[in-house]
Swiss-Prot record:
Protein role: Binds the lower part of the 30S subunit head. Binds mRNA in the 70S ribosome, positioning it for translation.
GO cellular component: cytosolic small ribosomal subunit
Domain of life: Bacteria
Gene this protein is translated from: rpsC
Ranges annotated as spanning the membrane: none
Signal peptide positions (record): none
Name of the protein in question: Small ribosomal subunit protein uS3
Domain KH type-2: 39-108
Any GO BP annotation: translation
Similarity comment text for this entry: Belongs to the universal ribosomal protein uS3 family.
UniProt keyword terms in alphabetical order: Ribonucleoprotein, Ribosomal protein, RNA-binding, rRNA-binding
Quaternary structure note: Part of the 30S ribosomal subunit. Forms a tight complex with proteins S10 and S14.
PANTHER family associated with the record: 30S/40S RIBOSOMAL PROTEIN S3, SMALL RIBOSOMAL SUBUNIT PROTEIN US3C
GO molecular function: mRNA binding; rRNA binding; structural constituent of ribosome
Length: 238
C-alpha cells in the first residue's frame, strides 16, 4: 500500500529550503534541536491569533539567533510602536539565553498558504461548522486567489460518527510526484467534543525551476525586524 510523504521534505534542497539553518557538533546538536522546538512551540502558542504560517530559525557563529516569523497578520505581531515584536524577542531570549533578532514576514495571500488554510478549517470545525462546508469554502477561496490546484482531507469521527473515516475533496491539479511542482503542504488538528480531527491540505502553485539557495516566493514580504545590537540598544526597521 502506497504512503504519502511530506511534500515539503521531499523537495528540500531542490525547490524548497530548510526551515532551520545552523551547524553544531555532536555534543551540542541535541540541545539546539530541542531549543528550536521549544522556540517554535512558544511562538506558535503566543501568536495563535496572528496566523503564523512558518517559523525559520538561523544560528550564527557569534552566538546569535535569528527568528523569521511568517504571518498573515504582521500588525498584530509587531504591535503598537513595535512593542509586540520587542516583547516576543525578549521572551525568546529567555528560552535560548542568546542574542535574538526577530524578523516579521508578511504572507500576502493567506488563502494559498496550506498551513493557514488547514488551521482555518480546524478553527471552523471546533465551532461546529460542517466539515464539508468548511473544506469547500477554503478550496473556492484558494482557487480564486490564484492556486492551480488544492486538495483537502479531514480524518476522524466526522459529524460525530461512531467509526472514524477520512473524507477529502480536490479541485484542479495537484502533481505530488513532480519534484519541480511547488506543492505547499499544511496540517492542523481540531479538538471537538467527539475527539481530535486531523486536517491535511495540499496546494499546487505552479512549477518552478530548481535553483541554488532559497526559492523566492511572491507570497511573502518582509515588513519589519527587531534585534539587539552590541551596545544593548534596540534597533528596529520597518
Amino acid at each position: 500500500m502506497g504512503q504519502k510523504v511530506n511534500p515539503h521534505g521531499l523537495r528540500v534542497g531542490i525547490i524548497k529550503d530548510w526551515d532551520t539553518k545552523w551547524y553544531a557538533n555532536k555534543r551540542d546538536f541535541g540541545d539546539l534541536l530541542v531549543e528550536d522546538n521549544e522556540i517554535r512551540k512558544f511562538v506558535k502558542k503566543k501568536l495563535f491569533l496572528s496566523g503564523v504560517s512558518r517559523i525559520e530559525i538561523e544560528r550564527a557563529a557569534n552566538n546569535k539567533v535569528k527568528v523569521n516569523v511568517h504571518t498573515a497578520k504582521p500588525g498584530m505581531v509587531i504591535g503598537k510602536g513595535g512593542q509586540g515584536v520587542e516583547d516576543l524577542r525578549k521572551d525568546i531570549e529567555k528560552i535560548s539565553k542568546k542574542n535574538v533578532a526577530v524578523n516579521v514576514i508578511e504572507v500576502k495571500r493567506p488563502e494559498t498558504d496550506a498551513q493557514l488554510v488547514a488551521e482555518n478549517v480546524a478553527f471552523q470545525l471546533e465551532r461546529r461548522v460542517s466539515f464539508r462546508r468548511a473544506m469547500k469554502q477554503v478550496m473556492q477561496r484558494a482557487m480564486k486567489s490564484g492556486a492551480k490546484g488544492i486538495k483537502v482531507a479531514t480524518s476522524g469521527r466526522l459529524g460525530g460518527a461512531e467509526m472514524a473515516r477520512t473524507e477529502g475533496y480536490s479541485q484542479g491539479n495537484v502533481p505530488l510526484q513532480t519534484l519541480r511542482a511547488d506543492i505547499n503542504y499544511g496540517f492542523a488538528e481540531a479538538d471537538t467534543t467527539y475527539g481530535k480531527l486531523g486536517i491535511k491540505v495540499w496546494i499546487y502553485k505552479g512549477e518552478v525551476l530548481p535553483t541554488k539557495g532559497r526559492v523566492a516566493s511572491n507570497n511573502e514580504e518582509v515588513v519589519g525586524n527587531v534585534e539587539k545590537n552590541t551596545r544593548g540598544k534596540k534597533r528596529e526597521a520597518k
